[in-house]
Amino acid sequence: MAQPQPPAYENKNIYATLPRTQRGQPIVLGADPKGKNFLYTNGNSVIIRNIENPAIADVYTEHSCAVNVAKYSPSGFYIASGDASGKIRIWDTVNKEHLLKNEFQPIAGPIKDISWSPDNQRIVAVGEGRERFGHVFMSETGTSVGEISGQSKSINSADFRPARPFRIVTGSEDNTIAVFEGPPFKFKMTKQDHSRFVQAVRYSPDGKFFASAGFDGKVFLYDGTSSELVGEFGSPAHKGGVYALAWKPDSTQLLTCSGDKTCRLWTVESRELVSEFVMGTTVDDQQVSCLWQGDNLITVSLSGVITYLNVADPSKPLRVVKGHNKPITVLGLSDDRSTIYTGSHDGVVTNWNSGSGTNDRITGTGHGNQINGIAAWGDFVYTCGIDDSLRQFSVEGNSYTDYVVKLNCQPRGLAILRNENIIALACIKELTLVQDQKKIFSLPIKYEASSIAVNADTSDVAVGGDDQKLHIYTLKGGVLEPKVELDHLGAVTDVSYSPDLKYLVACDAHRKVVLYSVEEYKPAHNKEWGFHSARVNTVAWSPNSLLVASGSLDTTIIIWSVANPAKHTIIKNAHPQSQITRLVWLDNNTVISTGQDCNTKVWHVENI
């Protein structure tokens, strides 16, 4: 009997994006009733992240526009997620495919919060609709079980009382809290204690109280049944707007987080402050969300960073989860391949341990905006960005050094000729060579360069151009001399020499990947590598020079065989609804990809 073939590829790991944040906008984290994961969103994706080991994550990308909020059902078997168009998708958590159970359109505008009734049967969804700001419906059928009315502006937050008699509370931008009784749910009263937007309303897990938080810095406590005001936490609770609040599972304490860059822990009974967590001093340290799940107190900063608070010692967080929440534009490896480097279009550079996925951010003064090139060389990693500079950070110190070379125009890529001690940069209007932190040569060009690669054997430099040509230069005595031009059918987007220096591969906007032999710069075979259906963004070589990986705007990665050009492996939907921005091989069977979705993925690929 024939042995079953191993799968041609497998997704080993996802180094997940951080939550997408926006100044002045609270975000909602979703708690898992089984205590294993927590939920947040970024772009079209819902991220299901393991709470004990954040290196484990699952990503759901089925919404056709930005997702704002996702919440587990109390049973833990379903997740409801709401997007910017007002759609709610209810999907299964048990299967890896996350099968869709239902899709409803409760309001015609962005959904800002979702809450399930404790019996899993009803859902309240609120936001910024056209004719109404919220709706209550059955999770199975979508039939209405009441109406959310009585508030005149967008509703930011809603919660179901977790015990009978059922109640719903909503917090709105008209500064009021509305209370509804049912089912069917009818407007009962408004509370007008806040003087600014109400950003969060949450019932205690036992249903005895509910608390509200607003941009006036105040946090109020109300009776869960009668909805009478019980009192206020602090006077006021925070110096800045309060973005979110979270109850301790036993209902005895409350956690609040604020734009004043602090989180505070309160006793519910006496409404007194227990401890304060100072999260930093910069705008990026504003706290925009919090969650209390089991023993984990989690907060999210404006920078997207997730912090696990330490109740025993407020000054030392238990864990800080870093990464990216903007699209990743560059990807590189340290010389020993133990560290993966990623850089995003907001200038953040992250290092990831290639074995465990643990990560940290590079500190110091970097580019502060989009990074277009990255390359490691010994103890340093070099980056170039659209601040028109070349910079370096130290591998050991994990921090940018004071090495800066100002460039005349925007760099699009960099490559290092180690034996010559030269860094070659492809810029929009010129090619520049840098040696010992000085520009030693620049060559004006009539095309716009997109990428650059160097061949240490022949001292050839290959540059991709938007003039549909691949330009080859030779480096002689610190000067670049044109050697040959190779025609493509579209703008050349990326170029790379094979590790054994015998081949050059280039990809273009006309969906093609072309392999050249370096000897004569002629195509290495007569097969057309044209299976992408849109612009190819990036190409990368396996260390043994036998396989080429290409990533495209069409969301797929294709692995091509050099020895057997007719064979290839297609990884469809590698980053769903997101173009592949960069690829690199960790070893001969492992490819790392980054996408517009801010995720970094690790793939195991079988030999072809």
From Swiss-Prot:
GO MF, one example: actin filament binding
Record's keyword annotation contains Protein biosynthesis: no
CC terms in the record's Gene Ontology section: cortical actin cytoskeleton; cytoskeleton
Compartmental location: Cytoplasm, Cytoskeleton
Tissue specificity annotation: Expressed in pupal wing cells.
Disruption phenotype: Pupals exhibit grossly abnormal epidermal hairs on wings, an abnormal accumulation of F-actin and microtubules, and disruption of the frizzled-based planar cell polarity system. RNAi-mediated knockdown results in F-actin accumulation and moderate border cell migration delays in stage 10 egg chambers. RNAi-mediated knockdown in border cells results in accumulation of F-actin dots, enriched with Arpc1 and GMF.
Pfam families: WD40
Gene Ontology biological process terms in this record: actin filament depolymerization; border follicle cell migration; establishment of planar polarity; imaginal disc-derived wing hair organization; locomotion; negative regulation of Arp2/3 complex-mediated actin nucleation; regulation of actin filament depolymerization; regulation of actin filament polymerization
UniProtKB keywords: Actin-binding, Cytoplasm, Cytoskeleton, Developmental protein, Repeat, WD repeat
Listed SMART domains: WD40
Cysteines engaged in disulfide bonds, as pairs: none
Main location class: cytoplasm
WD repeats: 62-101, 106-149, 150-190, 193-232, 237-276, 323-362, 366-403, 444-483, 487-526, 531-570, 575-607
Function: Induces disassembly of actin filaments in conjunction with ADF/cofilin family proteins. Together with GMF, promotes Arp2/3-nucleated actin filament array disassembly. Essential for organismal and cell viability. Required for the development of normal wing cell planar polarity. In egg chambers and together with GMF, plays an important role in directional migration of border cell clusters.
Family: Belongs to the WD repeat AIP1 family.
Protein name: Actin-interacting protein 1
Organism annotation: Drosophila melanogaster (Fruit fly)
Gene encoding the protein: flr
